[in-house]
């Protein structure tokens, strides 16, 4: 049976940590574990998912729930609340619902204080891992038979009915997803006609849609290193860009960190034209994936091919001209003497930056794509290197298993982020005394996860921002500082500092609080907005150079309503508790941030959310940011428009239900069938409550509360519905804890700020 291990080094001599691995979550298979009843429960969950996989594509993260709820059994479970009419919503009904919800949520808290969970969703991550392990000869050493079995289960479970795979688990089939996952299954040992016909159906989809020459640029790169595509069929990724002077707007150091940290190792592999061992499987794949014989493929034509199913961001003409010039003129010079000397210098610079990233994330790396690319680069440089060995145990940090199988996550988890939201949700209920143990553990995790030092060396040389005092998205070992994670972390420690230490634990020291404020103040852009990891370093026209056909807005770090609002809210709370510390800077930052939020509001009153689905999420942040800055419904046209927008989207069930299509199409779209979603409903309620909706007409809030109460499951959990996270406009990602966090938070605010105040106004 699989077992989730928390804060565990697994006895590896190759693991490094700044805080004794707090927050680390890995799955380990032990054949001796599991009673017959437990094993049957897991198999039932797997069978149930497989039966309904085309209708419900998101797992409910049941393996983790089975384990942790057994390790942390609930106290006496209160009976489920049933509501007939909204008049039946009493304070007792809401409080019982909250107690049931927090009780359950507390049972899924890990012993180190964080909430583990599924952060999967994208379907292009695991192929890079498997291709890298195959090339380096480490596949069987790293992945056990059980790992491979669960990975295959996952891929078959998320194969679409037409035979292909999407960019993410809910998406339509794409060439990128279909080719890479087909290759992954073959490398994992599946036969060319294996999987009860699924392999054959996948191959048919690929060939019917033009074959692998039409895969996206990232796919072309992965196939090239594997030996199933020629490098001359790729658009250039010259590592010489890293030698440009930094004052040029196109310098990679000015790009969004995720973008540059992916293209850094890609440029190293491209610059070396590295190709892995040509195995029988590789030779077979050359025959399986293309519509013409491999030796007849026009690789120059293939450079610019992309299947229409994948084309979210078509290349502008200027980009095609640039790639053609680099390919036909510049690259031939750099591959031969004397230009080869410059190429060697560029490769040395690239690998130096790769090692810096590896060492300062304890070999976790910023994300799963550059993690496996960096690992491959270390092996290419020296197959016997210590760097390559240090990479291997950190692969497990990215693997997660649920009833749908084993997946590769979009980060090494969302530990800090989910914990920060969980604490704020429970605090909002005013039931902290009842759940002080849960809050105390979470508080310790928050304190243990703060980044305590800046990156070593000259930060400008490594293109890094300050990090001392920040909070990361996942763990301190990961360590990349993020604006909204720092803000949410700061909000938590400030809120908990107002409770007795014997109830929630000792507060964070003022010095460490000030360090966090320093990071937040340092991240505000001239326009008042906050981006993610760093300041916005270049211009939006740089997006013309975005070579990734699948993703939008990836080249620079844009400012976002979510990051700006979180920073603003944290500083308003800080100012209240520490009114004299950097008073003028804090006040100016708040003022500029509020103005930025107002400026980027959509004409219909919404805000576009870039990190979750979508307009309900963005509008929650937009409204709460303005309210924190002193705006209200009466004095702010922005808040009035936002409330009108949200109320116009409320469904007959009383809830809100927004489809991921809102993100990619930038138009509000309901979930098919007009279904409400507990997470969207939570966000909308929080925004409306914050904007004073209860004072004007509480009925929409009562209807929404009724929907949430009725949605609660018998055990206090809430149902897993459609996927709710997103990045780069077009790719969805899972936040398994959101279904617990936001109903708790919304009902908590409802109980304390709406119910009693509006009881006399309630209507049918």
UniProtKB/Swiss-Prot annotation:
It catalyses: (S)-2,3-epoxysqualene = cycloartenol. SUPFAM superfamilies: Terpenoid cyclases/Protein prenyltransferases (SSF48239). InterPro entries: SQ_cyclase_C (IPR032696), SQ_cyclase_N (IPR032697), Squalene_cyclase (IPR018333), Terpene_synthase_CS (IPR002365), Terpenoid_cyclase/PrenylTrfase (IPR008930). GO terms for cellular component: lipid droplet; membrane. Oxidosqualene cyclase which catalyzes the conversion of oxidosqualene to cycloartenol. It is found in: Membrane. It is a single-pass membrane protein. Pfam families: SQHop_cyclase_C, SQHop_cyclase_N. GO terms for molecular function: cycloartenol synthase activity. The active site is at residue 484. The chain crosses the membrane at residues 609-629. Keywords: Isomerase, Lipid biosynthesis, Lipid metabolism, Membrane, Repeat, Steroid biosynthesis, Transmembrane, Transmembrane helix. It is an enzyme of class 5 (isomerase). Its EC number is 5.4.99.8. Belongs to the terpene cyclase/mutase family. This is Cycloartenol synthase. GO terms for biological process: steroid biosynthetic process; triterpenoid biosynthetic process. PFTB repeats lie at residues 148-189, 513-558, 590-630, 639-680, 701-742. Expressed in all leaf tissues.
């Amino acid at each position: 049976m699989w077992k989730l291990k928390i804060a565990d080094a697994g006895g590896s001599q190759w693991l490094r940590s700044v805080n004794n691995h707090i927050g680390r979550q890995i799955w380990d298979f032990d054949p001796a574990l599991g009673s017959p009843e437990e094993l049957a429960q897991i198999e039932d969950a797997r069978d149930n998912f497989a039966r309904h996989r085309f209708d419900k594509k998101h797992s409910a993260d049941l393996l983790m729930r089975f384990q942790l709820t057994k390790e942390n059994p609930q106290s006496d479970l209160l009976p489920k609340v049933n509501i007939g009419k909204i008049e039946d919503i009493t304070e007792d009904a809401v409080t019982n619902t909250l107690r049931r919800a927090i009780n359950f949520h507390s049972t899924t808290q890990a012993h180190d204080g964080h909430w583990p969970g599924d952060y999967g969703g994208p379907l292009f991550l695991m192929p890079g891992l498997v291709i890298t392990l195959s090339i380096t000869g480490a596949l069987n050493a790293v992945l056990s038979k059980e790992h491979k079995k669960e990975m295959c289960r996952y891929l078959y479970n998320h194969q679409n009915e037409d035979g292909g795979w999407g960019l993410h688990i809910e998406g339509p089939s794409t060439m990128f997803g279909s080719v890479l996952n087909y290759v992954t299954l073959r490398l994992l040992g599946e036969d060319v006609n294996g999987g009860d016909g699924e392999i054959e159906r996948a191959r048919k989809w690929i060939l019917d849609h033009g074959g692998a020459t039409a895969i996206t640029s990232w796919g072309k790169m992965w196939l090239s290193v594997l030996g199933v595509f020629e490098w001359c069929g790729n658009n250039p990724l010259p590592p010489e860009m890293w030698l440009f002077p930094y004052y040029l707007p196109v310098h990679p150091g000015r790009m969004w960190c995720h973008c540059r940290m992916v293209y850094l190792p890609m440029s190293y592999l491209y610059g070396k034209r590295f190709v892995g061992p040509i195995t029988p499987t590789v030779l077979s794949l050359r025959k399986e994936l293309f519509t013409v014989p491999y030796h007849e493929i026009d690789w120059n034509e293939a450079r610019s091919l992309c299947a229409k199913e994948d084309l979210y961001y078509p290349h502008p003409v200027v980009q095609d001209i640039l790639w053609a010039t680099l390919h036909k003129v510049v690259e031939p010079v750099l591959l031969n003497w004397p230009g080869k000397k410059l190429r060697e210098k560029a490769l040395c610079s690239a690998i130096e930056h790769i090692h810096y990233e590896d060492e300062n994330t304890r070999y976790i790396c910023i994300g799963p794509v550059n993690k496996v690319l960096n690992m491959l680069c270390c092996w290419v440089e020296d197959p016997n290197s210590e760097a390559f060995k240090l990479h291997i145990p950190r692969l497990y940090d990215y693997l997660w298993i649920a009833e749908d199988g084993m997946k590769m996550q979009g980060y090494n988890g969302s530990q800090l982020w989910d914990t920060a939201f969980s604490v704020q949700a429970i605090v909002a209920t005013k039931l902290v005394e009842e759940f002080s143990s849960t809050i105390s553990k979470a508080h310790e995790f928050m304190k243990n996860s703060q980044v305590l030092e800046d990156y070593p060396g000259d930060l400008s040389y490594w293109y890094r921002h300050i990090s001392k005092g920040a909070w990361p998205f996942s763990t301190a070992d990961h360590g990349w500082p993020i604006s909204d994670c720092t803000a949410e972390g700061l909000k938590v420690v400030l809120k908990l500092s107002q409770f007795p230490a014997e109830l929630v634990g000792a507060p964070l020291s003022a010095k460490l609080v000030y360090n966090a404020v320093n990071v937040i103040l340092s991240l505000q852009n001239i326009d008042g907005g906050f981006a993610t990891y760093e300041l916005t370093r270049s211009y939006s026209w740089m997006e013309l150079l975005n070579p990734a056909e699948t993703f939008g807005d990836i080249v620079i770090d844009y400012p976002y309503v979510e990051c700006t609002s979180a920073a603003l809210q944290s500083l308003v709370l800080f100012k209240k508790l520490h009114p004299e510390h950097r008073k003028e800077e804090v006040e100016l930052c708040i003022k500029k941030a509020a103005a930025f939020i107002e400026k980027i509001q959509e004409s219909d009153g919404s805000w576009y959310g870039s990190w979750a689905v979508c307009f309900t999420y963005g509008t929650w942040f937009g409204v709460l940011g303005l309210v924190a800055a002193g705006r209200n419904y009466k004095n702010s046209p922005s808040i009035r428009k936002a409330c009108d927008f949200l109320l116009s989207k409320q469904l007959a069930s009383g809830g809100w239900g927004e489809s991921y299509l809102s993100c990619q199409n930038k138009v509000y779209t309901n979930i098919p069938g007009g279904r409400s979603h507990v997470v969207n409903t939570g966000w909308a309620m929080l925004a409306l409550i914050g904007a004073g909706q209860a004072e004007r007409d509480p009925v929409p809030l009562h209807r929404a509360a009724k929907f949430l109460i009725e949605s609660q499951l018998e055990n206090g959990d809430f149902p897993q519905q459609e996927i709710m996270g997103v990045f780069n406009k077009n790719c969805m990602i899972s936040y398994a804890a959101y279904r617990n966090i936001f109903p708790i938070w919304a009902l908590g605010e409802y109980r304390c700020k709406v119910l009693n105040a509006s009881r006399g106004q309630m209507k049918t």
